[in-house]
Design a protein with these regions (language model features):
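Extended amphipathic, helix-rich lipid-handling scaffolds
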Residues: 1-58, 66-291, 303-377, 386-508, ...
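Short aromatic-acidic-glycine turn motif
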Residues: 15-16, 596-601
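Outer-membrane beta-barrel and related beta-rich outer-membrane complex signature
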Residues: 379, 599-609
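Short "repeat-start/strand-capping" segments in structured domains, especially the N-termini
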Residues: 512-513, 585
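C-terminal structural cap/anchor segments
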Residues: 576-579, 585-593
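A cross-taxonomic marker for long C-terminal extensions/tails that follow the last structured domain
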Residues: 633-667
Length: 703
């Protein structure tokens, strides 16, 4: 027999009476509207219709219950609406159980099995949820989560999570945010067991920054698979995954880079323990498209505070050219414009131990370079192939590290150096990089321009913090000026260049020398000393020096520079000469002829060009008389005194006669000539314009 019924009922304190429910429900009564039939013979209750209303939700459903020693449910279906998320908060793992949730969810359930050991399958859905915690906020969150629950575990399969406007902003710590985040995942949850979550994450518009704003990432697009295990009892989280970034900009101290061209991939297998704030990295590998793969393993203590690291970093396929382009050129080309003119190649390997806090990080290990190359983009010069094996010990800190024992020594071998039409044979030396100091232990010998250049005692006291500070000695031995001027595309002249500079020092933006360079040319000698270079690594270096001229044959000098023909001997000095962008900007000069008993004559062409330089006028109108019968004239004195500063050139002659400054003083014997400087003060830029005109003048201003 069967009993058909339709009734209403109220279950008092429903949540307190049903201990088997996996979720703790709010206290209150449960109101039921039931319709169905009951078979006395089978002790079976069939619910054709169920409507339920309680403080935590409303629901509709159908089902079958067999009453025996333990009531058993079969073919039961329930649809819950307007479920407040607070009912699940206490059952979430830390830190999710400490956040607040606003919004509602819907759930569809299918139940079967003994009343005290139900098997439940279903699906939970929600949209437009909001999440807020002490350090985190989510503006909008939607979730779709199929699940299975039994007495042993709660298992979610194929979870779909979409979140927008996520912000993580703890005080005085790293902060992060994202415009959009999508997660597809599955996880298992058992009471007193670690939560296991695996799936895939896709994020866009992601960004982060350090507490001091020195490290910033923006517009990041990140995606990849992951697996996360959260152990509430041990307060630990294990994360493994492979994450790729398709776009984004990164600012890390002075470095700025666009990740779009590099397609970075981060491969992780790490554990984080909250109580000890420690990250153990079994595998933390970073790959950049043009740089290579860097493998990292070890531990980071005080991870969320100023970290202290104990890591091993290594690579077998590191590209110095890719590193130079991505990390150095764009970051430092304004400070060092020379970088824009360089190209670097080769393959590097390294194995480095990193220890200490990030603001005083110690690095020790070995690096090697094969088939290295350094060249000008214009291909004017090339150094390579280069082979390097270098042990190193450095400290990334503002202050220099304390002195240690004797440094380990490595080797540097350069197979070839090409400069213009010169090729320098192989070079080998030993070197060390210890306590931030880079030292070459053997001199470098360069066979070039028919002579030799020796660079010795090359030393950077603090390569990392002050790379501009360098010291070395230099010695040149009989370089052939004919080959040198040809290589530099200067006017060709012969002679040799010899010099010894026992000390060259560069500090900040100034390079100073202590010594003298001597050039034997034009039949005489030029000695250069007090050489200084201001801003040597900029696009506009300034060179300062003093020069002494002895026994210069004017005939060789004038013919070399196509200035007509002048015979005689020139001597004098040029003090405080400053060259900027290849042009003099300051000098004090006293150059004059010296009578050594030889011929002293000057051609009409040379006279005319001197006249144009001194007056700005061609001498043709003044040329006449007997001068037309001669192509050269005798002189007794020739020269000038000049001072240049701030584009103002003050020009004085080799002899003063009243208010006249004589540039050329004629001899007692004819044919003779005098040239007067008609311009004693002139803009140096105007003098350069006159130089452009001298080839148009062929007659002197004759008195």
């Amino acid at each position: 027999s069967a009993i058909t019924f339709a009734s209403t009922a109220t279950l008092m304190d429903f949540a307190g009476g049903w201990r088997a429910m996996p979720i703790k429900l709010p206290k209150g009564d449960l109101a039921l509207n039931l319709a169905g039939h009951y078979s006395v013979a089978d002790q079976t209750l069939v619910l054709n219709s169920l409507r339920m209303s309680a403080p935590f939700a409303s629901a509709t459903g159908t089902g079958r219950v067999v009453f025996g020693a333990v009531p058993t449910i079969s073919a039961a279906k329930l649809i819950f609406r307007d479920l407040p998320l607070e009912i699940a908060q206490a059952h979430l793992p830390p830190p999710l159980n400490r956040w607040s949730y606003s919004g509602q969810a819907q759930a569809s359930l299918e139940l079967q099995g003994p009343w005290n050991a139900l098997d439940v399958t279903g699906r939970v859905e929600s949209s437009m949820l909001q999440v807020r915690g002490d350090d985190i906020a989510v503006a909008s969150l939607s979730v779709a989560a199929p699940f299975e629950w039994n007495k042993l575990a709660l298992r979610f399969k194929d979870i779909k999570v979409q979140a927008t406007k996520i912000v993580y902003s703890p005080n005085q710590r790293w902060q992060a945010a994202a415009d959009k985040l999508q997660i597809g995942a599955a996880f298992d949850y058992q009471a007193d067991q670690p939560l296991k979550l695996s799936g895939r994450i896709d994020g866009s518009g992601m960004k982060f920054k350090s507490a001091d704003d020195s490290k910033v990432g923006e517009n990041l697009s990140v995606h990849g698979p992951f697996e996360l295990i959260a152990d509430a009892a041990a307060t630990s989280v294990s994360l493994s995954g492979k994450f790729s970034a398709d776009s984004g900009e990164l600012l890390w101290g002075k470095f700025f880079g666009d990740l779009k061209t590099q397609k970075p991939v981060l491969e992780l297998n790490a554990d984080y323990t909250r109580n000890s704030d420690r990250l153990d990295c079994r595998r933390c590998n970073l790959a950049l498209a043009s740089v290579g793969i860097v493998a990292v393993g070890g531990a980071v203590d005080h991870f969320s505070e100023p970290p202290n690291v104990r890591l091993l970093a290594s690579s077998a396929n590191f590209s110095p050219g890719g590193f130079f382009e991505f990390f150095l050129r764009e970051t430092f080309n304004r400070q060092f414009p020379l970088l824009d003119k360089l190209a670097i190649a080769g393959q590097m390997a390294f194995r480095l131990q990193l220890n200490g806090p990030l603001n005083a990080l110690g690095i020790a290990g070995d690096i090697s370079l094969k088939n290295g190359e350094l060249r000008a983009k214009s291909n004017d010069w090339r150094i390579g192939p280069i082979a390097l094996d270098l042990p190193l010990q450095i400290l990334l800190a503002d202050s220099k590290p304390a002195a240690a024992g004797a440094p380990r020594v490595g080797t540097l071998a350069i197979e070839r150096i090409r400069f213009a039409n010169q090729t320098i044979p192989p070079i080998t030396t030993t070197l060390s990089l210890s306590n931030n100091a880079l030292r070459l232990h053997q001199p470098i010998h360069l066979a070039i321009f028919g002579g030799e250049i020796e660079i010795g005692s090359l030393f950077w006291p603090d390569l990392l913090n002050d790379p501009k500070q360098v010291a070395f000695s230099a010695e040149t031995k009989r370089l052939k000026l004919e080959e040198l001027t040809q290589a530099l595309n200067w006017p060709r002249f012969s002679g040799t260049l010899t010099g010894s500079i026992p000390q060259v020092q560069s500090a900040e933006n100034l390079l100073r020398t202590n010594g003298e360079i001597q050039a034997e040319l034009f039949g005489g000698r030029i000695r250069m000393g007090k050489l200084e270079i201001d801003n040597p690594f900029s696009s506009l270096p300034s060179i300062k020096l003093d020069a002494k001229l002895d026994a210069i044959q004017l005939e060789q000098l004038s013919q070399t520079f196509a200035f007509g023909r002048i015979s005689g001997i020139l001597e004098g000095s040029i003090d405080n000469l400053v060259l900027t962008d290849g042009q003099p900007s300051e000098l004090r000069a006293d150059l004059h002829s010296v009578d050594r008993g030889g011929e002293q004559r000057i051609s009409v062409e040379a006279l005319n060009k001197i006249t144009v330089l001194s007056s700005g006028e061609d001498a043709g109108a003044l040329y006449g008389g007997l001068a037309g019968f001669f192509d050269s004239f005798r002189y007794s004195k020739l020269g000038f005194k000049a001072t240049l500063k701030n584009d103002r050139l003050t020009l004085r002659g080799v002899e003063s006669r009243g208010d006249q400054e004589m540039l050329v003083v004629g001899s007692f014997l004819p044919p003779t000539v005098n040239i007067v400087s008609h311009t004693q003060n002139i803009a140096f830029s105007e003098l350069l314009r006159r130089l452009e005109r001298i080839n148009k003048s062929d007659k002197p201003n004759v008195q």
